[in-house]
């Protein structure tokens, strides 16, 4: 295999894939990125058996082939190479040579056939949503996602799509976050859709979502996976196969106390109070805080 890339274009494709590459795994193939030639360029694939990404990059293909190159080393090499053309060449002994100008590196590659089979990147249900809208919803609830909780559904965010209304819920047994908003949706499915996505997968998805108002992403729901189809890349993740908790019963139907407070001063006060209350419990930060309400005044103590 011999291919020639523009360095910055290849590096821009490789960096987002590092979050879906398995680190220190007994299966060497999933510690790398599969580079496979195709018409007009190359397809890069990364998959850690839970989440993955496929990206198409334009390049000059001199000799066809498909090989797995260590993701960490590949990104480190590309960072230090000079701008311009980068040549990747693999010989019959599976030695990959990465060169640019007078600089060159040699690594060991694995045959592309060792790479795990990717799930089918198609779904029965499909809808399109603005990237900024989806980003807003995820950001509003990510803080309450559990980490390594024995109840698997709490380690993710529960999404419900009903018409043009999208609801996102997270709960770590201490906190519950809910974000509901009307979105500009285009859907090929008339009924309600719901699914639970792992928090780790959403962390990587946030890195891909654009903040522009005009950008959208097509989402396809398969039996076990959900696929996010961007313009030149596809991100997919396994869904959490579990029923979500009945979160609505934790939200009071009626309230005796209503308080309105200015946001910025309240946030600054919470930040100061949290300096002496934070403690780590099972990998999560817990911050007990006492709120005292009097007429015209809210006192925070810790």
Segment roles from a protein language model:
Residues 1-302:
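Structural preference for solvent-exposed beta-strand-turn elements
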């Amino acid at each position: 295999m011999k291919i020639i890339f523009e360095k910055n274009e290849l590096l821009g494709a490789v960096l987002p894939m590092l979050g879906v590459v398995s680190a220190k795994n007994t299966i060497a193939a999933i510690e790398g990125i599969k580079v496979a030639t195709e018409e007009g360029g190359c397809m890069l694939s990364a998959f850690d058996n839970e989440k993955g990404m496929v990206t198409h990059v334009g390049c000059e293909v001199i000799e066809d082939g498909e090989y797995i190159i260590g993701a960490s080393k590949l990104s480190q090499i590309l960072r230090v190479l000079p701008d311009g053309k980068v040549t990747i060449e693999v010989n019959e002994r599976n030695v990959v040579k990465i060169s640019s100008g007078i600089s060159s590196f040699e690594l060991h590659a694995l045959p592309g056939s060792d790479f795990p089979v990717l799930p089918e990147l198609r779904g029965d249900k499909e809808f399109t949503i603005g990237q900024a809208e989806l980003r807003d919803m995820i950001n509003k609830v990510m803080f309450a996602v559990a980490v390594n909780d024995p109840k698997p559904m709490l380690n993710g965010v529960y999404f419900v799509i009903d018409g043009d209304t999208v609801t996102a819920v997270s709960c770590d047994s201490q906190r519950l976050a809910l974000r509901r908003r009307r979105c500009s949706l285009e859907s090929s499915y008339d009924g309600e859709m719901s699914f639970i996505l792992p928090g780790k997968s959403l962390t990587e998805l946030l890195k891909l979502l654009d903040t522009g108002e005009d950008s959208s992403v097509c989402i396809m729901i398969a039996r076990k996976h959900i696929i996010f189809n961007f313009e030149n890349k596809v991100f997919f993740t396994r869904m959490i196969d579990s029923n979500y908790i009945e979160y609505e019963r934790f939200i009071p139907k009626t309230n005796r106390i209503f308080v309105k407070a200015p946001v910025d001063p309240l946030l600054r006060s919470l930040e100061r109070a949290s300096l002496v209350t934070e403690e780590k419990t099972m990998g999560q930060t817990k911050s007990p805080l006492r709120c005292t309400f009097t007429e015209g005044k809210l006192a925070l103590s810790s």
